[in-house]
């Protein structure tokens, strides 16, 4: 007997092992059948089967599984398997969710039958698993069935493996499984039978299956279909056409395959550069892609239809998706090629072979399907009653809530739904009332769409089927029983009652809003808001608004400081309306729908337009109360659509920094000086608040989680009930956001943050905010900056020959805070230009300038306003005033109007605009135009007129006309706080003579008004009308000019000269091609104008610097001696080709000519002026490193670069001039020697070149020898020395050599390396020669310095052990969103930084204590916020670049050379070294001379270090995956919103045609009813627009988060290397990264604080709304 028992045990163990190891569905069922037969077990005995099996199988491998299952079955909720003892359940579908539900029901004691249509598990598609899902499956013994389950950092599994695993567990716990069985329909009980008669059954195929005779109490649909079970209405979520392709390739498990990194995914909005390169190289256009490695190499991607058509995958284009993707319309061979090519590119061609796996049909495993529409059931369960028999019907899995595949939520949410359903069935078995049961289930179901891995309970051990253990803050009674009465179907209800009851699920707030908010109520509200205003009498919604006063009054009521109502002229209707439109767009984010001119038409404004436009004000300020400052404080909580500035205006302010193209001008905006001063001040406040804040580890993590939670809730609510109040809670507090928010995201756009007067002599004395205390490091800068400014002012004062410049400077120096308000509030007097004779005017101007300078010194805190100065100035002259004429060719243009190209007869020339401020600066780039001067010309600096008030002084003599125009413009600046640009008198005269003063002309009149689409020239109806940059267009017409992709408002860039819009990627390409084209047409030193570009938020003007033939030397001196924080240099626009060809213009200037000086002076500003803010930020954050004064020659820029935003821009970059590249042969330097430079520039007045990423364009043609070329700056320890500048000219062949990464020069010796090391106190990095220590210019010295520079550059490349690997694998610091991509500019980037920052960082040794105290204030936690700069600026050809910015396990190539003696600042940051990532350990540090010394040395703590690295990598990967999924959600939601908007627009167009009688209607339709319908559509459209803005805000936050994570990872990797092994450039790069992180933290801090404030407001409003609803007898619920 003993032997028999032992044999029996051994046999049982072997049979059970066979069952466990089965790899197919059929094999598993067969092994299970054999196991039961051999062990004499009855699988139909569901109650005792598990116990019998556990008793029979006792071998050691099974005991671990029994222990896990026993622990699970021991949960109290199961009541030891008796909770549902008499319940019979049918589950339709054998997917993961169906089996998971079956397991729970079996543990509850229910009889469970699973029917599955197929008998094979063939889907190799990979599922992403949430942490709780992994924990749950492990507790069920997943490792026993599949040993590779989630090994290491793997968090995914193929559907086939998961199904097999769950099938085996289900069989073990007594679930009855039938395959090859198809559900057909429910069979109702016979009507005439007793209570113990036949119950509910299922009709199945084949009919002879035993399941057809079973009766059930519960039926669960889990087959993933949408119509298997009747009674469940569905909500559709339609996005843009989305065609998914899945592909499975054979995984041979080779070493090469194992090394290929998985790709968690890339969303188009997250890494556009990758997709652009993919399209350019392969023609494949994708929106996202994922790669997982399991039994197969699994790829899934979303392809764009046009790409599939172009590649021949889809044969014919059809509108119907079914026909489009029909089998006979798909070329299978092309599809295979398409997917393989995308997979090859995505893995960087690292997979050795891509052979398709074979599916169960014997075909290559690739599929293409449509998921344009996703569906969700409106309810999760219902109860049917027939003949006194009740049946509970429920849905789980995809049948309940279809997932968006890139998110990986299908399995996770499906399991949660399975647990919730099991909980419901337990209540059903215990006799709970059906309505109570359904109401609880619906309450829980409403949480499901918004669940994420972050917002569910983290205590996985406590998870049970009880929802309270899984959902924090669960409210299981938010849906009341009476609200689900329609889900109890007894056959006594008719369809109409069912439909009516279904409406009870709608939000109370929405219903009340729709019943109360009508056009009549809108009119009444407008009347109440505008009463008691002069000239305003609102009696209707059209003619009453014609004058524009009513709109201005409406704005003034809400924000009195925005409009000076008393100064408005009632007769100037167009101006008043345009003013209101501009202010509303700028301050409230309300896009205009028409123009001021059209409002002034005889027929008056269109009523439909006014309803649409005024409704936005109504929603924003409805029943808002005024605070003392006139800001709205509260919002009517009963209005679900009331939302604040947060959604629209906040997003606009965020994107101000994102725009690369400043506008030429805007009306009624702050002056350039004011705006830049405030930006500087705001930056210091943000920076110091960041520095003085406590360590941000916990704080940032909390904020990050809050933001993520807010985003999730927002998206989920929208997903759950598309048009209902899901949007409301995220956007209810718009109107009061300004009053309470601590700091605006972009303080430059908000006049309330204007700084008080900032004197030129005291630029560092800015008033403190309540929240901010100046850092001691900032104080360290004050004396330095003040001394620089004083020195500069004295220098400027000593120049007496050029006076008008100083007058204008003084005007610009006026009070920052008062300039804006005074210009807005004071009445605008008519402009009276004077025309005195030339000599008296100049004499008076000189006298006045001297008086102003003296007064500025004596009374720095009591200066006169601009207006007073202008009045005094005008009083000094005599003569008959010339009456101004309005130039008909330059009509008023709104701030949103697009700046057009400058007329060829009109050329603007610009001079420097001093703006004293501690921090600064709008990037301003310049090109020069060499104009032929007929006589001695004095340069005059004037401020440009606002287009709406530009004057053309009559046809008087040119000199008098110019003087009159000068005074007119000067006086006008008192009321036009636009960006100051400067005009030379020569150009002003030309403008006056031609009758053109406007900088831009209105778009061609042939394009029509606001009802004509600027792109397609077709009619654009009101509801479908969008506006940007003053243009009006259809949504579908708003596309990138290059790639044709759809653009979104706020996420576009605009070229003001060409009148074209671009996406981020192609705007950068546009800049590149523009510079290349300009370079090709340059000739003999003549520079063509740089493109003037603009965006929809920036207001920078185009500034220019003319280069006349004969300029006074004082002019050049004035230009040189302006303080570094005051320089503005820009473009002189010349389009007349005849001028370019003028021999006098093209002739090179003599060495000592003033023209040459002006050229050099102008070029200095081209680089430095863009970078002032950068320099100031660095000096603020790292004062001990960067405070010491140094001087350098300013590089002159041959390359025209575009006017860009300041250093705060998310898209910051600087395009490095060509000469930053070093020729391969230093002998070419002989061709680059410039003429002698007589100019001298004091050190303290030259801004330092800041930390900027560089991009070098290789296509520039060879410039002429007379063209000034940029030079790399030199550094000297002598604080008063001057730097002569030399030209650099490169031939085309030399440029090509520079782009050869494999370039080596064995001729370079180690002696040259030593030369650089000897220049330790002041590293000399020059093009031409060492800098002399005396101020006088010197003749060109020998080539020693330049040769040394070139050698050093070459050494940095040749030292790497593998230059090709360096190109391919080096992380791209300059392109943070595509770290692996190859960037030509990176070749020269580090040397540029070395020339600009190493000298700063090493000007003197720093103590570790000094820097440590500074850096302790910088939050660098691993989970703090992330920030970014744009990665679209440089788009070079792809050179084996890596796949995504989300990669983790990059293997770094060889690094650059390591200079000796560079042991400065970052040596104290060694505490970060233990956090270094695995990349650093894999990085080979070697050079040609000391490779052995550079080898990484393993220490005794190597094992511990590796363990920490693995943990860090896993955590980083997890964080990246979370960001990816959130990005995918945002991307999908944006597409859905766009589709909903398009649907609304179609309805609105049809309705508008009816209202206008364009559809042939006889007019019998009730207009009032139609207007009511129109208004409802308007409200819905406004709501969707706000939601879209909110989604873009969250996308911005996500981008910042991702970038900061990568910056910190890069910093830790670098700090793992000892400082003694680093070169100077590497130390500088570490400093750069640190500053980058600080900037990102600042951005995210602001954004997070604003979003958190918004959340708190919404929470309070929700409580008020709930109280209101309950007090009025409504049942409170959210939908």
Swiss-Prot record:
Location of region: Disordered: 661-772, 818-838, 874-907, 1073-1163, 1194-1247, 1259-1283, 1302-1342, 1473-1509
LIM zinc-binding domain mapped to chain residues: 1011-1073
User: What do mutants without this gene show?
Assistant: Small hearts that fail to undergo normal looping at 24 hours post-fertilization (hpf) with thin, linear morphology compared to wild-type hearts at 48 hpf. moreover, cardiomyocytes hearts are spatially disorganized. Defects in srf:mkl1/mrtf-a-dependent gene transcription.
Question: Where's it found, cell-wise?
Answer: Nucleus; Cytoplasm
Q: Where is this region: Monooxygenase domain?
A: 2-494
EC?
Answer: 1.14.13.225
Q: Report the family membership.
A: Belongs to the Mical family.
UniProt name for this protein? [F-actin]-monooxygenase mical2b
- The organism is Danio rerio (Zebrafish)
The organism that produces this protein has a lineage beginning with:
Eukaryota, Metazoa, Chordata, Craniata, Vertebrata
């Amino acid at each position: 007997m003993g032997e028999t028992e032992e044999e029996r045990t051994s046999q049982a163990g072997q049979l059970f092992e066979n069952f466990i190891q089965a790899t197919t569905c059929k094999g598993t069922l067969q092994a299970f059948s054999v196991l039961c037969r051999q062990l004499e077990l009855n699988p139909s005995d569901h109650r005792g089967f598990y116990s019998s099996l556990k008793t029979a199988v006792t071998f050691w491998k099974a005991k671990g599984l029994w222990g896990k299952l026993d622990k699970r079955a021991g949960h109290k909720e199961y009541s030891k398997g008796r909770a549902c003892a008499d319940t019979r359940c049918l589950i339709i579908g054998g997917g993961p969710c169906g089996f998971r539900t079956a397991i729970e029901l079996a543990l509850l004691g229910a009889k469970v039958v699973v029917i599955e249509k197929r008998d094979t598990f063939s889907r190799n598609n990979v599922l992403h698993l949430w942490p709780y899902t992994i924990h749950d499956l492990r507790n069920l013994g997943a490792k026993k069935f599949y040993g590779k389950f989630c090994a290491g950092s793997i968090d995914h599994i193929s559907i086939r493996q998961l199904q097999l695993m769950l099938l085996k567990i289900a069989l073990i716990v007594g679930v009855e499984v039938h395959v090859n069985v198809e559900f057909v329909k429910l069979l109702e009980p016979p009507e005439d039978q007793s209570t113990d008669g036949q119950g509910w059954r299922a009709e199945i195929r084949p009919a002879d299956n035993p399941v057809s005779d079973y009766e059930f109490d519960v039926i669960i649909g889990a087959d993933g279909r949408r119509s298997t079970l009747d009674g469940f209405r569905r909500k559709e979520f339609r996005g843009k056409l989305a065609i998914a392709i899945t592909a499975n390739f054979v995984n041979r498990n080779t070493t090469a395959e194992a090394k290929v990194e998985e790709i968690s995914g890339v969303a188009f909005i997250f890494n556009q550069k990758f997709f652009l390169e993919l399209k350019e190289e392969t023609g494949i256009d994708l929106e996202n892609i994922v790669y997982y490695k399991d039994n197969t190499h699994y790829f899934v991607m979303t392809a764009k239809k046009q790409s599939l058509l172009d590649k021949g995958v889809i044969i014919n284009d059809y509108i119907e998706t079914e026909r489009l993707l029909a089998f006979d319309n798909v070329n299978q061979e092309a599809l295979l090629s398409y997917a393989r090519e995308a997979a090859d590119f995505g893995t960087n061609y690292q997979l050795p072979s891509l052979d398709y796996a074979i599916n169960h049909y014997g075909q290559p495993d690739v599929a293409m399907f449509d998921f344009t529409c996703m569906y969700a059931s409106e309810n999760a369960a219902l109860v049917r009653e027939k003949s006194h028999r009740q049946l509970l019907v429920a849905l789980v899995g995809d049948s309940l809530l279809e997932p968006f595949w890139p998110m990986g939520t299908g399995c996770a949410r499906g399991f949660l739904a399975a647990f919730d359903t099991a909980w419901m069935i337990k209540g059903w078995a215990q006799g709970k009332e059906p309505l109570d049961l359904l109401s609880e289930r619906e309450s829980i179901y409403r949480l499901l769409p918004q669940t994420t891995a972050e917002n569910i309970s983290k205590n996985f051990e406590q998870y049970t089927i009880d929802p309270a253990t899984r959902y924090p803050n669960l409210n299981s009674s938010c849906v009341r029983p009476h609200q689900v009465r329609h889900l109890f179907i007894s056959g006594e209800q008719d369809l109409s009652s069912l439909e009516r009851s279904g409406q009870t699920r709608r939000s109370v707030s929405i219903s009340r809003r729709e019943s109360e908010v009508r056009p009549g109520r809108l009119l009444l509200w407008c009347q109440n808001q505008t009463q008691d205003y002069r000239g305003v009498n609102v009696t209707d919604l059209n003619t009453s608004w014609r004058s524009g006063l009513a709109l201005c009054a409406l704005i003034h009521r809400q924000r009195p400081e925005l409009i000076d109502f008393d100064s408005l002229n009632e007769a100037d209707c167009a101006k008043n309306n345009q003013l209101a439109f501009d202010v509303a767009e700028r301050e409230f984010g309300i896009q205009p729908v028409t123009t001021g001119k059209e409002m002034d038409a005889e027929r008056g404004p269109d009523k439909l337009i006014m309803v649409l436009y005024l409704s936005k004000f109504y929603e924003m300020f409805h029943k808002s109360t005024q605070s003392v400052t006139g800001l709205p404080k509260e919002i009517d909580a009963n209005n679900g659509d009331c939302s604040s500035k947060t959604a629209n205006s906040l997003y606009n302010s965020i994107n101000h920094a994102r725009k690369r193209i400043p506008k030429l001008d805007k009306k009624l905006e702050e002056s350039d000086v004011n705006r830049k001063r405030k930006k500087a001040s705001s930056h210091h406040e943000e920076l110091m608040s960041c520095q003085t804040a406590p360590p941000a580890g916990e704080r940032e993590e909390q904020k990050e989680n809050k933001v993520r939670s807010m985003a999730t809730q927002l998206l989920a609510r929208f997903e759950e009930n598309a048009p209902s109040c899901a949007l409301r809670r995220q956007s209810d507090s718009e109107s009061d956001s300004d009053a309470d928010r601590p700091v605006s995201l972009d303080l430059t756009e908000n006049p309330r943050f204007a700084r008080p007067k900032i004197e030129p002599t005291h630029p560092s004395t800015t008033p403190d905010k309540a929240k901010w205390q100046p850092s001691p490091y900032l104080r360290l800068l004050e004396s330095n900056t003040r001394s620089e400014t004083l020195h500069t002012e004295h220098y400027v004062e000593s120049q007496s020959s050029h006076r008008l410049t100083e007058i204008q400077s003084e005007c610009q120096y006026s009070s920052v805070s008062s300039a804006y308000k005074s210009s807005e509030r004071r009445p605008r007097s008519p402009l009276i230009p004077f025309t005195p004779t030339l000599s008296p005017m100049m004499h008076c101007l000189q006298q006045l300038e001297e008086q102003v300078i003296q007064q500025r010194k004596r009374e720095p805190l009591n200066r006169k306003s601009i207006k007073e100065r202008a009045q005094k100035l005008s009083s000094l002259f005599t003569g008959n005033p010339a009456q101004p004429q309005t130039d008909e060719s330059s009509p008023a243009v709104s701030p949103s109007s697009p700046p057009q190209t400058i007329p060829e007869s009109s050329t603007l020339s610009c001079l420097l605009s001093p703006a004293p401020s501690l921090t600064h600066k709008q990037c301003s780039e310049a090109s020069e135009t060499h104009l032929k001067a007929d006589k001695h010309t004095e340069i005059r600096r004037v401020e440009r007129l606002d287009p709406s008030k530009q004057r053309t002084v009559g046809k008087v003599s040119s000199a008098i006309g110019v003087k009159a125009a000068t005074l007119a413009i000067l006086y006008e600046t008192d009321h036009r706080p636009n960006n100051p640009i400067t005009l030379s008198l020569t150009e002003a005269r030309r403008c006056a003579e031609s009758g053109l003063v406007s900088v831009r002309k209105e778009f061609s009149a042939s394009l029509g008004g606001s009802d004509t689409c600027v792109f397609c020239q077709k009619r654009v109806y009101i509801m479908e009308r969008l506006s940007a940059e003053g243009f009006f267009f259809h949504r579908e017409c708003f596309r990138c000019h290059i790639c044709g992709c759809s653009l979104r408002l706020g996420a576009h860039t605009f070229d003001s000269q060409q009148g074209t819009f671009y996406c981020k990627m192609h705007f950068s390409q546009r800049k590149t091609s523009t510079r290349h084209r300009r370079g090709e047409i340059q000739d003999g030193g003549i520079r063509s104008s740089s493109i003037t570009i603009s965006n929809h938020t920036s207001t920078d003007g185009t500034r220019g610097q003319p280069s006349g033939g004969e300029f006074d030397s004082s002019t050049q001196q004035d230009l040189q001696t302006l303080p570094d924080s005051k320089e503005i240099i820009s473009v002189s626009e010349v389009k007349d080709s005849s001028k370019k060809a003028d021999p006098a213009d093209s002739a090179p200037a003599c060495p000592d000519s003033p023209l040459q000086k002006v050229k050099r002076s102008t070029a200095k500003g081209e680089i430095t002026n863009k970078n002032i803010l950068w320099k100031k930020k660095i000096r603020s954050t790292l004062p001990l490193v960067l405070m010491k004064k140094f001087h350098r020659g300013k590089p002159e820029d041959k390359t025209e670069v575009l006017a860009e935003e300041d250093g705060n821009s998310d898209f910051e970059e600087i395009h490095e001039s060509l000469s930053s590249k070093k020729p391969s042969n230093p002998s070419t330097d002989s061709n680059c020697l410039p003429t002698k430079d007589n100019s001298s520039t004091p050190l303290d007045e030259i801004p330092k070149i800041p930390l900027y990423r560089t991009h070098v364009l290789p296509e520039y043609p060879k410039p002429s020898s007379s063209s000034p070329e940029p030079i790399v700056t030199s550094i000297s320890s002598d604080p008063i020395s001057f730097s002569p500048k030399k030209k650099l000219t490169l031939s085309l062949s030399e440029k090509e050599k520079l782009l050869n990464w494999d370039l080596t020069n064995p001729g370079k010796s180690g002696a040259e390396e030593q030369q650089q090391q000897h220049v330790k106190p002041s590293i000399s990095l020059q093009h031409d020669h060492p800098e002399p220590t005396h101020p006088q210019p010197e003749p060109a010295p020998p080539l020693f310095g330049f040769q040394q520079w070139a050698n050093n550059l070459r050494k940095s490349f040749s030292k790497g052990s593998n230059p090709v690997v360096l190109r391919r694998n080096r992380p791209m610091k300059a392109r943070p969103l595509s770290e692996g991509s190859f960037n030509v500019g990176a070749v020269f980037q580090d040397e540029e930084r070395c020339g600009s920052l190493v000298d700063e960082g090493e000007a003197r040794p720093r103590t570790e204590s000094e820097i440590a105290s500074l850096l302790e204030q910088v939050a660098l936690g691993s989970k703090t916020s992330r920030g970014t700069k744009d990665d679209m600026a440089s788009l070079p050809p792809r050179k084996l670049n890596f796949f995504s910015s989300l990669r983790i396990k990059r293997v770094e190539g060889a690094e650059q050379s390591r200079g000796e003696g560079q042991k400065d600042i970052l040596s104290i940051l060694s505490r970060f070294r233990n956090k270094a990532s695995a990349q650093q350990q894999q990085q080979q540090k070697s050079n040609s001379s000391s490779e052995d010394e550079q080898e990484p040395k393993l220490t005794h703590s190597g094992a511990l270090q590796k363990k920490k690295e693995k943990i860090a990598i896993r955590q980083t990967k997890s964080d990246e995956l979370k960001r990816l999924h959130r990005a995918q959600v945002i991307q999908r939601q944006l597409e859905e919103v766009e589709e909903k908007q398009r649907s609304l627009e179609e309805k609105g167009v049809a309705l508008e045609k009816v209202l206008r009688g364009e559809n042939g209607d006889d007019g019998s339709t009730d207009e009032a009813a139609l207007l009511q319908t129109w208004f409802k559509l308007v409200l819905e459209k406004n709501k969707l627009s706000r939601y879209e803005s909110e989604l873009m805000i969250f996308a911005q936050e996500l981008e910042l988060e991702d970038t900061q994570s990568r910056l910190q990872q890069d910093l830790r990797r670098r700090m793992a290397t000892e400082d003694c092994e680093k070169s100077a450039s590497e130390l500088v790069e570490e400093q750069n990264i640190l500053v980058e992180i600080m900037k990102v933290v600042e951005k995210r801090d602001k954004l997070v604080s604003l979003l958190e404030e918004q959340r708190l407001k919404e929470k309070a409003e929700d409580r008020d709304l709930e109280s209101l609803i309950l007090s009025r007898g409504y049942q409170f619920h959210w939908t």
